[in-house]
Amino acid sequence: MAVLALLFCLVTFPSCILSQVQLKESGPGLVAPSQSLSITCTVSGFSLTGYGVNWVRQPPGKGLEWLGMIWGDGSTDYNSALKSRLSISKDNSKSQVFLKMNSLQTDDTARYYCA
């Protein structure tokens, strides 16, 4: 019976469960080629010490491309094709994750997301 009650809650009120976690990106709208891009992701609803955060991007008319991630312990993994130009860091006390990308090229034109 408890399982049915839980299932009813999940089906009827999914927003009350999923709306707790939020990630919001902030940064410049446009950056010129050869310049650097810096984006901040502010999270709420979970602790950065216990969970990792990924960065992805989506060029116009294309699919998502994984850039890299930072784990709860602060270690990082990067897309090998972009590793030399990327840096991901975080400030646990401010619940913020930072993406920095250097030497931008026209191929870097995309929407950038944290997830």
From Swiss-Prot:
It comes from the Eukaryota. PROSITE patterns: IG_LIKE. GO terms for cellular component: extracellular region; immunoglobulin complex. SMART domains: IGv. The keyword Ubl conjugation does not apply. Residues 1-19 form the signal peptide. This is Ig heavy chain V region PJ14. Disulfide bonds: none annotated. GO terms for molecular function: antigen binding. It holds the Pfam family V-set. The keyword Signal applies. It comes from Mus musculus (Mouse). Keywords: Adaptive immunity, Immunity, Immunoglobulin, Signal. Residues 20-115 form the Ig-like domain.
